Amino acid sequence: LRSFVFIERISEVTDVFASERSFAEVSRKIASDAGVADVSGYTDYGRVWLEFRDTVVDDLDPRSTVIVLGDARTNGRDPHEHAFAKIAAAAGRTFWINPEPKLYWNYGDSVMGVYEPYCDGVFECWTTHQLETFVRAVAQPGSVTQAARRRR
């Protein structure tokens, strides 16, 4: 299991989760050491997908599951759909958990609709009930949707 965090840049934090059990300490270490913010402090999904593709995609295989937790807001930057598509194609399953209400998806700078076709499941997740729904769906054997696979 590998874990990554991002804002403008992506950073692997697997070691932080392996060495710390306190949520407060994990949060502190990530905030101070992860190097995820560059200049603006605004999310840059496109840059993140390019970096992830270039550094991690070769480690993905059909047994891999990629889970993204984010609002898909690009702040007007290029979403680099092709990079995300390559990541999703390399993984066995790709899921997206969006903490914003669905009402706000694809509104303003949200590009959820750009990434959704490459995902096996996209979940609105801003309540504990919605989180439970996501966990149940991911835990189901064969939860990969054939429609999502055909679009890749």
Where are these regions (language model features)?
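Short, well-ordered secondary-structure micro-motifs
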Residues: 14-18, 78-79, 107
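Von Willebrand factor
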Residues: 25-64, 101, 106-107
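MIDAS-like acidic motif and immediate structural context at the N-terminus
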Residues: 1
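Cofactor-binding loop segments of dinucleotide-utilizing enzymes, especially the Rossmann-like FAD-
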Residues: 6-8, 71, 99
